């Protein structure tokens, strides 16, 4: 490995960490503003009704989910719809960390008191924008720029690994 390759790898890792941190910040804000939709079915309903307000689509799957043919078909359809409607897409490679981020806020809410039901479907998460203020949010702007740069490099659905805390 040459010095240039080592330096480029380090920069890429640092950049991915920054993008992961920005994603955490966007999710935290979306939870507090209630501008988040969780679940494949719920996401499909929202995309059908109001695609113009969706600013980010997250698809989360681990290695076990990669063998789920039905889920992969859903992902393909959602990706196609998002590309057609200029919605940025990110693939999250560690859905466990995504669950931690999304369920920390909801544990104290009514969902936790319903008893031991099935865990929520976190395979698809949509972030909507209630106002035209998306460009004022630096974390969301960073994610949008990252998605745009990835598309320029023919990586239409970039994979993000959320940093463990």
From Swiss-Prot:
Residues with the Phosphothreonine modification: 2
Pfam families xref list: Ribosomal_L7Ae
Subcellular location: Nucleus
Biological process annotations from GO: cellular response to ionizing radiation; cellular response to mechanical stimulus; negative regulation of blood vessel endothelial cell migration; negative regulation of transcription by RNA polymerase II; positive regulation of apoptotic process; positive regulation of JNK cascade; positive regulation of p38MAPK cascade; positive regulation of reactive oxygen species metabolic process
Cellular component, GO annotation: cytoplasm; nuclear speck; nucleus
SUPFAM superfamilies: L30e-like
Keyword DNA damage annotated: yes
Gene Ontology molecular function, alphabetical: kinase binding; protein heterodimerization activity; protein homodimerization activity
Top-level division of the source organism's lineage: Eukaryota
Keywords: Cell cycle, DNA damage, Growth arrest, Nucleus, Phosphoprotein
InterPro entries assigned to the protein according to its UniProt record, in alphabetical order: GADD45, Ribosomal_eL30-like_sf, Ribosomal_eL8/eL30/eS12/Gad45
Family, as annotated: Belongs to the GADD45 family.
Function: Might affect PCNA interaction with some CDK (cell division protein kinase) complexes; stimulates DNA excision repair in vitro and inhibits entry of cells into S phase. In T-cells, functions as a regulator of p38 MAPKs by inhibiting p88 phosphorylation and activity.
Subunit structure: Interacts with AURKA, PCNA, GADD45GIP1 and MAPK14.
Name of the featured protein: Growth arrest and DNA damage-inducible protein GADD45 alpha
Phylogenetic lineage: Eukaryota, Metazoa, Chordata, Craniata, Vertebrata
Underlying gene: GADD45A
């Amino acid at each position: 490995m040459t010095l240039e390759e080592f330096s480029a790898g380090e920069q890429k890792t640092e950049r991915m960490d920054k993008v992961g941190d920005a994603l955490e910040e966007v999710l935290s804000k979306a939870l507090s503003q209630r501008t988040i939709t969780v679940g494949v079915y719920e996401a499909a309903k929202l995309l059908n009704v109001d695609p113009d307000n969706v600013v980010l689509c997250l698809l989360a799957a681990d290695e076990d989910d990669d063998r789920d043919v039905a889920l992969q078909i859903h992902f393909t359809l959602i990706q196609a719809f998002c590309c057609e409607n200029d919605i940025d897409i990110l693939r999250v490679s560690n859905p466990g960390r995504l669950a931690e981020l999304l369920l920390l806020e909801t544990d104290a809410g009514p969902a936790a008191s319903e008893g031991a039901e099935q865990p929520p479907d976190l395979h698809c998460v949509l972030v909507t924008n209630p106002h035209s203020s998306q460009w004022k949010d630096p974390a969301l702007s960073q994610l949008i720029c990252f998605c745009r740069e990835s598309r320029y490099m023919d990586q239409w659905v970039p994979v993000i690994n959320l940093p463990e805390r």
